[in-house]
Amino acid sequence: MKNLHVISHTHWDREWYRTFQQFRMQLVHLIDNLLVILDNDPDYLHYMLDGQTIVLEDYLRVRMENFAKLQQYIQENRILIGPWYILPDEFLVSPESTVRNLLIGKHICELFGQRMMIGYLPDPFVHIGQMPQILRGFNIDTAALWRGVKPGMPTAFTWQAPDGSQVLLAHLYFGYGNIAHWPVDTLENSLASLEFAAKRLELHSNTSQYLMMQGTDHIEPHPATAESIRFYNEHNPDGNVAVHSTLPAFFAALSQEIEDKNIVLPVHIGELRDPQKAHMLPGVLSSRMWIKQRNWKAQTELERWSEPFSVWTEVLERGEDRACC
């Protein structure tokens, strides 16, 4: 029996083939619809906002009146946010930028009362070797990603940084949208589609916990999700069980199975940048160089000048004659 963890989500690029404001219009429409689904269908259990928190800021600048409702559903674990502020391109920003990204994401998650403690990295163009070390610095011991994994690695393995820090990694073998447009036109076809996706994963899985990623770029939640999961569980011929799940629930089940069955996971040390299974897109290292130069100048001035010198005001405050006596 396989456990199919259906993860309803979207992958959100704030600007890409459309402008930021055009994509924000879509984002507002998406979250408005999500709130309607959550209001009206108690069986629609979870939706993940791509591991980012900046989308909440973008939405609330237009729909501030929905803050309380968003906060409620986040605290109820029906909307999952974080741990990132924004999904990083790991090779194009400084190490400190990556750390601050997680730190700001943590602060925003605390404001809403819930934080997804998974290193979710669905689409960065390959991965730095120190990422497990950075994640463990924020008490995150699991990660899920797609690109850069060499052929032959299973869906679950251990990723290790050069300093020895390790995380349990879920390899999104067929990407972050292996059931992106599920459910389909009929309940029967939806059953067959989910069964096909499970059989594809079976060839590469070393556990019985399968990630079924129901989402892709800028896609909205599907209102028939809960009904389609019920139909699948009642009629599938293989005895598999589908559940409307979350990444934390998936990793809890995965960790328990690894422990119960004494599964020995392969270990990968360092960078994940193999191009054979998924495009590395190395052209991003040199495209629009003026943007990269300005970004590097801004982050360097913040890291090396503005922030270090700003602390001197606090030091000097303590040098007043009565304070130092």
PLM regions and their residue ranges:
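Catalytic-domain carbohydrate-binding cleft regions of carbohydrate-active enzymes
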Residues: 1-325
